[in-house]
């Protein structure tokens, strides 16, 4: 089993449990150059809010889009957008990525901005 398939296996297991709970999910996807965050409805078929370093408004504020500062900016942006739509409680779906570095920075920034998970 290679690194990617192991991560996907971990992510699938976590998503199955979150689906049983019927929770709104804050999903994170990470690449070496960018980080993406989406708030997905409990049914799993609707993206309620999204933010990423690909967006011009966020990328202009940053020197580089693949570091912890960029992840924190995305976390803050997605939390503010979720609160505008009335979403306060979410479950954090790290997509099989280790809770460390950029993933942790995004989660901490989202918590500081008012999301609860």
From Swiss-Prot:
Keywords: Phosphoprotein, Ribonucleoprotein, Ribosomal protein, RNA-binding, rRNA-binding. The protein has been shown to contain a phosphoserine, which was required for the protein to bind to 5S rRNA. However, the presence of this phosphoserine is controversial, and it has not been seen by mass spectrometry. Residues 1-17 are annotated as: Required for binding of the 5S rRNA/L5/L18 complex to the 23S rRNA. InterPro entries: Ribosomal_uL18_bac-type, Ribosomal_uL18_bac/euk. GO terms for cellular component: cytoplasm; cytosol; cytosolic large ribosomal subunit. GO terms for molecular function: 5S rRNA binding; structural constituent of ribosome. It comes from the Bacteria. One of its GO terms (biological process) is cytoplasmic translation. Part of the 50S ribosomal subunit; part of the 5S rRNA/L5/L18/L25 subcomplex. Contacts the 5S and 23S rRNAs. PANTHER family: 39S RIBOSOMAL PROTEIN L18, MITOCHONDRIAL (PTHR12899), LARGE RIBOSOMAL SUBUNIT PROTEIN UL18M (PTHR12899:SF3). This is one of the proteins that mediates the attachment of the 5S rRNA subcomplex onto the large ribosomal subunit where it forms part of the central protuberance. Binds stably to 5S rRNA; increases binding abilities of L5 in a cooperative fashion; both proteins together confer 23S rRNA binding. The 5S rRNA and some of its associated proteins might help stabilize positioning of ribosome-bound tRNAs. NCBIfam families: L18_bact. The basic N-terminus is not necessary for binding to 5S rRNA. It is however required for cooperative binding of L5 and L18 to 5S rRNA as well as for binding of the 5S rRNA/L5/L18 complex to the 23S rRNA. Belongs to the universal ribosomal protein uL18 family. This is Large ribosomal subunit protein uL18. It comes from Escherichia coli (strain K12). The gene is rplR.
